[in-house]
Design a protein with these regions (language model features):
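Extended substrate-binding grooves/exosites of carbohydrate-active enzymes
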Residues: 1-30, 181, 186, 285-606, ...
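Surface beta-strand/loop "capping" patches
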Residues: 204-232, 580-619, 702-716, 827
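An acidic-aromatic loop/edge-strand motif
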Residues: 8, 75-78, 83, 92-99, ...
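Beta-strand/loop-rich accessory regions of lumenal/periplasmic or secreted enzymes
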Residues: 78, 175, 269, 654-663, ...
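Short proline/glycine- and polar residue-rich coil/turn motifs
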Residues: 147-150, 161-163, 252-256, 640-648, ...
Length: 986
């Protein structure tokens, strides 16, 4: 099929399309919709390039009986055509803008629709909500038009092409076009008609578009201004009703603008998403629009909504599903929004394109602030050879090739969603540099809609400030370090509000720095918040493995090139929306109430209301429990005092502390007081826990007077330590017990610094591998032992080393074994600070496979780390080895428990228990560290025939360095010198 080559012509973005308008569905006066959904099963033909498409497939009499069928909407890769591809930065095609490969996969779609005689006389429009990447449209064999911009809507008037009765619609979709260079988003690349297609039948004259803007007046009044644009002669009548359908005021028409004044207006916020209903009626049509009265502005470098300093607790969200790909239903979107609301999110950035047009309607209704982002990302230019240019990302922009396209995409985003109160910020796009095109697009945006904020992070790449950025209201960064944030606010002079449009990269086991960033968000009024990268793991469901696990595919699993591996697996939830532990960390860090201990003896606490618009007493109920080493002392509920947003109130908990050496912890749990559409009453929104009494250092169990010392037998390498019912082999070469036998079962020990790298270890991993940490070993310099009346004491000086490079650490270890077989270990270590920080330092125990029962006194029940433990609390927990495993799709270090006092693994008869004078990190797994390190998918994992148990002096934090900053020093196992004492009982 010979096509006009619009798809490689940046000067021809659209042919035959209607002027942009806001999204709405018109109804007749009888309240019947004027929209017909054309979605369903369409005829489909897949071809390797446009020239292979039959030229007559567009004709009504074309025999399409041999064509396949495909659901519309859908992505054709999800139905067996073409192949999936995941790439982040790199373009999937040769870089030759505006040209794309000649072998350009093409999908030919056909369907029919029927018009009555009356409908055929009206005006008819086709409305495409989303097509990737570009498409040509024919009706009844006649060319209607062409459009692109995958995630924005395109509308065509087809009145002159339709007939009474059956009409044939043919659409040809191309995989790539010149717009592909502007749609280089970090996602799986898919194609097709992936959103709904609507047929609109409208009267000869109608309301074409309208604009709603709201303002606040002193005294609590709200103003709603509506401008209406008509196609033809109409006399619109406007009414505004409250949520109970009662009219509120009358519209006053001045200079073509309708204005409602609402006394004592109920304001829209994410916490209180109150909506009025605007109705625009003509003789033949009715249009309704939800209206939220709210105002957003900046004063003195601070973002305000309705007069209150606002903090965004947000996430970046792609349209993504492991089965349906880009095609997302309302039910799927509501599933996401439900989880977000339940995990304390209040904001969404539509990364990096407009979501389905009804998505902002849902955000209006359920209460989310939205950064509405245009369908632009061009960071693939970074892979080209232009390293001498400061503004590499902006080269495509500066060249002028896509100047018109950038403006077009920004306009389509803004105009479509302009009437939604949830949209506080327009984002011009993502990672596409800053040049003339963005300067012009930014100016247009601010002029068109001065009532909202304008955002664009990539303006920071214009280091020499060659271009005007005055229209940008926010200083936006990605993954700025905590030091950079402090530096920004330390500078003198006026400044824009600071926002992290992406931060705390949530890939795999992580993120681990949420609390550190949140402390800064609350410290600086001008830090208006951040958006986690990102909401969900992107993957393709490839079926079920023999072991019953879902096989999720990511980059490289589809035979594609180029690809970026599992970098798409970077969400807070799994592809099926099962929460990662990281989203629990987020939930509790951004909890709506934060307590601080004022008086531990009286158990008086100050409760701070972290909500922005709601009195704490109206939103929260509070329960408490106090435990001593996991044993319940008391529990109850406390009345929540009336507390305005961002203020504190004190409460006293009726707790009598026992005289005990145990750790006494008070836990406060915050629950929702009333139901929200997405959150039930009584839903836990967070907790705080405080140590009321206890000892940082505990004395370990001492030897009883009647104990008899074990015997020691020397060999050429091993010391055999024997006592009643046990035999231990101590390796004088390595400085640790090679075997511990008791009750017919044997375990072994080794020093351990290696862990299966997490996704967030991907950068430091190179240093660890260069340092050969994965080949570490120990050798002793000296070993001595002594036997007194009750114990055996073995002392070794040890070098922790590896091949090729220098010593990692040197330490003295003292092992004390009593007659009952209890082992006490004391280590005095000095680390070589020329070497990278360690993944961990501790001991690894290899246990019998039958030992599957686990109990521990420490932080749980979720996995937790030194920088990711706010999701957990200190308590006594019981579990199983299987349940201690967090099944990341790409296997990695997991299942750690921070700040443990005690941990036991066994089978009910035999087992091992660890104690520490201070605390330790603990984990146990059916998989070896090596297995977790080398396997690419969780369904490939094979269980060991033993159980691996780790006791660590310190396990380094997980951070977010897969894309974010380096792990903060305080969370690294970088101690220059340290002492550690622990005890093992069998």
């Amino acid at each position: 099929m010979k096509l006009p080559n619009y798809y490689e012509d940046p000067n021809t973005l659209h042919v035959g399309t209607c002027e942009n308008r806001s999204y709405y569905i018109p109804y007749g006066q009888d309240l019947n919709s004027h929209a017909t959904l054309l979605s369903g099963d369409w005829r489909f033909g897949y071809y390797p390039y446009p020239e292979a498409v039959p030229a007559d497939f567009i004709n009504p009499d074309f025999d399409d009986s041999s064509m396949d069928t495909i659901p519309v909407p859908s992505c054709w890769q999800c139905h067996g055509y073409d192949y999936h591809q995941y790439t982040n930065v790199n373009y999937p095609i040769p870089f030759d803008p505006p040209y794309v490969p000649k072998e350009n996969a093409s999908g030919a779609y056909r369907t029919t629709f029927t018009l009555s005689a009356e409908a055929a006389k009206q005006r008819n429009f086709l409305y495409f909500e989303g097509v990737d990447s570009c498409f040509y449209v024919w009706v009844n064999g006649k060319f209607v038009g062409y459009s692109q911009v995958s995630h924005s809507s395109s509308e065509f008037e087809i009145s002159s092409f339709v007939n009474e009765g059956t009409n044939t619609l043919a659409v040809l979709v191309l995989k790539w076009c010149d717009g592909t260079y502007l749609e280089d988003q970090d996602k799986l690349r898919m194609s097709g008609i992936f959103r709904d297609v609507l047929l609109l039948t409208r009267p000869k004259s109608f309301v074409r578009d309208y604009t709603v803007r709201t303002f606040l007046k002193d005294g609590g009044a709200g103003v709603v201004r509506v401008s209406v644009e008509a196609d033809g002669e109409v006399s619109p009548v406007l009414t505004l009703c409250d949520a109970d359908k009662n009219p509120v005021g009358e519209a006053v028409l001045t200079d073509g603008v309708y204005e409602f004044t609402v006394s004592n207006a109920k304001l829209w916020t994410a916490e209180t998403p109150y909506l009025y209903t605007l109705t625009i009626s003509t003789a033949d049509e009715v249009i309704t629009q939800a209206v939220g009265i709210r105002e957003v502005y900046i004063k003195d470098g601070i973002v305000y909504v309705n007069g209150q300093n606002l903090k965004f607790r947000g996430t970046n969200r792609h349209d993504s599903d492991p089965v349906t790909g880009y095609t997302i239903s309302k039910e799927q979107a509501i599933r996401d929004l439900t989880l977000m609301k339940q995990f304390n999110f209040n904001a969404i950035r539509t990364s990096h394109y407009p979501n389905a047009p009804w998505f902002t309607e849902l955000c209006d209704r359920y209460g989310f602030y939205v950064i509405a982002e245009s369908d632009i990302e061009m960071h693939g230019y970074l892979s080209t050879y232009h390293s001498d240019r400061e503004n590499t990302l902006g080269l495509l922009d500066e060249g002028g090739v896509f100047t018109e396209a950038v403006l077009d995409r920004v306009q389509r985003n803004v105009i479509r969603d302009k009437n939604h109160p949830c949209v506080l910020i327009w984002s011009l796009g993502n990672e596409a540099g800053f040049g003339y095109a963005y300067q012009n697009a930014g100016r247009w945006t601010k002029e068109y809609d001065p009532t909202r904020l304008t955002h664009y992070e990539s303006s920071t790449w214009d280091h020499s400030n060659r271009f005007d950025k005055s229209m940008l209201d926010l200083y936006s960064r990605m993954y700025a370090t905590t030091e950079e944030v402090d530096s920004y606010f330390a500078e003198e002079g006026p400044k824009k509000p600071f926002i992290q449009c992406e931060f705390v990269h949530a890939m795999g086991n992580g993120p681990g720095d949420i609390e550190d960033y949140y402390q800064q968000i609350m410290k600086y009024d001008g830090f208006c918040g951040g958006f986690v990268w990102e909401w969900c793991d992107h993957a393709v469901n490839q079926g079920v493995a023999e072991n019953g696990k879902t096989m999720y595919g990511y980059g490289g699993d589809f035979g594609e090139y180029p690809h970026d591996g599992n970098f798409c697996m970077d969400g807070l939830v799994y592809p099926d929306r099962t929460p990662h532990t990281g989203v629990y960390e987020w939930k509790n860090v951004v909890r709506p109430v934060r307590a601080r201990l004022v008086d531990a003896h009286k158990v008086t606490l100050a409760l701070k209301n972290m909500l922005d618009f709601t009195d704490m007493a109206d939103a929260i109920t509070l329960s408490y429990e106090c435990k001593a080493d996991g044993e319940l002392l008391c529990s109850g509920e406390i009345a929540v005092p009336s507390t305005a947003p961002h203020t504190e109130s004190e409460v006293t908990i009726p707790v009598t502390l026992p005289k005990t050496a145990a750790d006494c912890y008070l836990k406060l749990t915050y629950l929702t007081k009333t139901a929200h559409e997405l959150v039930p009453a009584g839903h836990e929104v967070g907790f705080d826990q405080f140590l009321l009494s206890g000892s940082a250092v505990r004395r370990l169990n001492s030897v009883t007077d009647e104990a008899t010392a074990p015997t020691v037998t020397e060999g050429d390498r091993f010391l055999t330590v024997s006592g009643e019912g046990f035999t231990y082999q101590y390796d004088t070469f390595t400085g640790i017990f090679s075997s511990l036998e008791r009750g017919g079962e044997t375990i072994s020990m080794d020093y351990s610094i290696f862990r299966a790298p997490t996704d967030n270890d991907r950068n430091i991993r190179e240093e660890w591998e260069r340092a050969n940490y994965h080949h570490s070993q120990t050798r002793t310099y000296t070993t001595e032992y002594a036997v007194d009346g009750q114990t055996v004491q073995i002392t070794s000086t040890v070098n922790l080393c590896t091949v090729t490079v220098q010593s990692i650490m040197k330490f003295t270890v003292i092992w004390t074994i009593d007659g009952a077989g209890t082992i006490t270990c004391k280590i005095d270590a000095k680390r070589n600070t020329d070497m990278p920080y360690l993944p961990r330092f501790g001991v690894e125990l290899t246990l019998p496979k039958s030992w599957q029962q686990v109990s521990y006194l420490g932080y749980g029940p979720q996995e937790c780390y030194i920088d990711k433990h706010h999701l957990a609390w200190f308590d006594a927990f019981e579990s199983t080895v299987e349940n201690m495993h967090e099944d990341y799709i790409k296997p990695q270090e997991n299942g750690n428990h921070y700040h443990c006092r005690k941990a036991s693994v066994g089978n009910g008869t035999n087992g091992v228990t660890a104690y520490a004078a201070t605390s330790f990190d603990f984990s146990v797994s059916n998989y070896s560290d090596y297995e977790l390190a080398v396997k690419k998918h969780n369904y490939e994992l094979e269980e060991s025939d033993f159980v691996t148990m780790h006791l660590d002096y310190k396990n380094s934090g997980v951070g977010s360095n897969s894309c974010g900053p380096q792990l903060l020093p305080q969370y690294q196992m970088n101690d220059k010198e340290f002492e550690w004492e622990y005890q093992l009982k069998f």
